[in-house]
């Protein structure tokens, strides 16, 4: 069975994805209610009862609010670093089945090799993940990997090193710089937070990262996620990344739900 990634939803309203291998089914983040996650999984042909674990990037509600309902499943492992686990648990009455990892250490969960790495964001200890599977010399299951990188204000060199060489990349393209600047509903302080070094990635910075990684030869597919509903649009993101479509498969996750059509190929 090929490894599948289903982005169940991604926006400031909630983030959650299903990573499914032949032997393992995990959620990356749980930014919706447990009931909503269950419905989204059913739409993807999966059951919440079949989920083997949850991996959390950080404690913000659009990534972790579903843990409240999932905590009723007493034996469901939830992987997080200590600061994230403590921040989430402090808001709950039920004890979560925490599996604490140290940032930067590789560990095995079933048929997945997992490594976390710090990313700059205004939470206690935000991380990204790489997930790897397959074996050298196995014609039916060769080595493959995926990087999950959302909620970061800029891309340090060490983050680039962690994600260089993956075949699939999930990266945020949160806002268009001009739309954010012109937005009259957000106060100046909020705009500064969003575009600061512990905020979110603009379309421009996300594009520069993907363009650089596209020259490495290993990257095959990119998922653009966490689009702002107010300060970004599918059309702007599509136009920005269109010139890379001849090199990569690019999937834009609609913040209203679903997947936007692929960019039309243009010359960079």
Identify the meaning behind each predicted range.
Residues 1-44, 127-150, 168:
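Conserved beta-strand hairpin/beta-sheet module of binuclear metal-dependent hydrolase folds
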Residues 34-80:
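Active-site metal-binding motif and surrounding structural segment of the metallo-beta-lactamase
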Residues 61-64, 85-88, 123-124, 155-157, ...:
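Active-site environment of divalent metal-dependent phosphoester hydrolases
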Residues 81-143:
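Metallo-beta-lactamase
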